[in-house]
Amino acid sequence: MARIAGVNLPSNKHVNIALTAIYGIGNSTARKICTDLDIPPFIKLKELTDGKLEELRNSIAKLLVEGDLRREVSMNIKRLIDLGSYRGLRHRRGLPVRGQRTKTNARTRKGPRKAIRAR
């Protein structure tokens, strides 16, 4: 298991798939990193040399990933809430932020249904 950006990556998977285990790196970013470092994307992580692993670590260290990215996203949401903007209000109330309908649907964001009181 290679440890990159504080994450233990599965060594039996292909490099581009293993990199997606890092928060902030998706398929397209993983492919771009592999092409920039001349790493064949379908080589297993355990087959990489120590030099290539070090290059991979240095390349990922330049990106905003894991804790730093999570912190920045939460700070952005907190900023919206503090501004009192409409988006901040929706975040605070736990409702959909991007204009989706809420009369029906939006159950994931709103949580389980509240029981209607019998009269």
UniProtKB/Swiss-Prot annotation:
GO molecular function ontology, one term from the record: rRNA binding
Origin species: Nitrosomonas eutropha (strain DSM 101675 / C91 / Nm57)
Family recorded in the similarity comment: Belongs to the universal ribosomal protein uS13 family.
Classification via InterPro entries: Rbsml_uS13_C, Ribosomal_uS13, Ribosomal_uS13-like_H2TH, Ribosomal_uS13_bac-type, Ribosomal_uS13_CS
Keyword Chloroplast applies: no
NCBIfam families listed in its UniProt record: uS13_bact
GO cellular component entries: cytosol; small ribosomal subunit
Protein's name in the database: Small ribosomal subunit protein uS13
